[in-house]
Amino acid sequence: TGGPGTGKTELIKGLEFKGFNCEHEIVRKITEEAQKNGVDQFFLKDPIEFSKRLMLLRLNQYNKIQNTKYTFFDRGVHEIIAYLNFLNIDFENKFFEQTKEIVYDYVFILPPWKEIYKNDNARYESYEESVKIYEEICDIYKLLNINIINLEKTTVEKRIATILKSIN
């Protein structure tokens, strides 16, 4: 995981290429669907409704993989809370309670990386905002006592090597 634009998607593609089970980011799917219906930034327009849909989809991702040795997620369930915190949005306690039920064996986090950061139709945040989101993500995992392993700003191959060393 990590803030926006840190190389998560490329890392997931690299792990998948090596034969690992991977669950891709689903925010783009929700955002693109909303854009087809005339809503440019669904998360900004209705963060709670967006988060409810996202929670359901991420919980489904998590629940379907329980019989695999390793599955890598582009993003975790807990990050829904991090994004709501980033926007200072009040949310139902149910969101937080649902995230407490999810435990990952490892959380690998990618740091903000200005040199590779770029905006697109689903990534609206500035680089500075992406740093704050990264901090919120770190905070939510720490709050829930979930250990995070920091990955370096380096090639996908070196990041994968660090991950494989950590899980073996």
Language-model features: locations:
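Glycine-rich phosphate-binding loop used to anchor ATP phosphates in small-molecule kinases
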Residues: S51-I102
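Conserved glycine(s) of the Walker
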Residues: G7
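Conserved substrate/cofactor phosphate-moiety recognition/catalytic segment
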Residues: E16-L57
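C-terminal alpha-helix
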Residues: T162-I167
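A glycine- and Lys/Arg-enriched "phosphate-lid" helix/loop adjacent to the NTP-binding pocket
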Residues: N88-T155
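P-loop (Walker A) phosphate-binding loop of NTP-binding proteins
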Residues: G3, L15
